[in-house]
Amino acid sequence: MRILVENGRLLDPSRELDVQESLWIEDGIICEKQAFSANQADRVIDAAGGWVVPGLIDLHVHFRDPGLEYKETIETGCLAAAHGGYTTVCPMPNTKPSTDCPEVVKEVLDKASVACGVHVLPVGAVTVGQKGEQPTDVAALKEAGIVAISED
């Protein structure tokens, strides 16, 4: 599929890019230069007045899964994130049970692997059960896949 995004402000801090120009996407891959004309595009998006940016990262989300799924699941949280332009999220450990052991980290990552394509990078708890008493095994949590620790 060929998509042309026109009239947007392209922003990419990693490339020091801040320009008003078109963006061409072919089969899900951004093209470096004009790859096709507007009449060859399957879809044309007018981004006038908007920004076109790389995927956003939310370092502090509350998915509440496992244990409090009636508030938010990993799937619904990922869908909401994707709709908002986020490609990566870091769910806080304040779930039931909290993300304080490798088994819970694995559960979160397993659920995230079948969600909507948003990268989920779990945050581990600082203390067991988030009770502020016994420290978690941060090395084991890191090995399981956490990217940070928090008591939130």
Spans of features found by a protein language model:
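Metal-associated gating/positioning segment near the N- to mid-region
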Residues: A47-A112
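Short coil/turn connectors at secondary-structure junctions
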Residues: M1, Q40-D42, A48, V52, ...
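Conserved residues at the C-terminal ends of beta-strands
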Residues: L11, M92, D152
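Histidine-rich, glycine-flanked metal-binding segment
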Residues: M1-G55
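Divalent metal-coordination and catalytic microenvironments
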Residues: G8, L23, G28, G49, ...
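Short, glycine/charged-enriched secondary-structure capping and boundary segments
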Residues: V19, N39, Y70-I74, E103-K106, ...
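Histidine/acidic-residue-rich, glycine-tolerant segments that coordinate divalent metal ions
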Residues: T95-E107, K111-D152
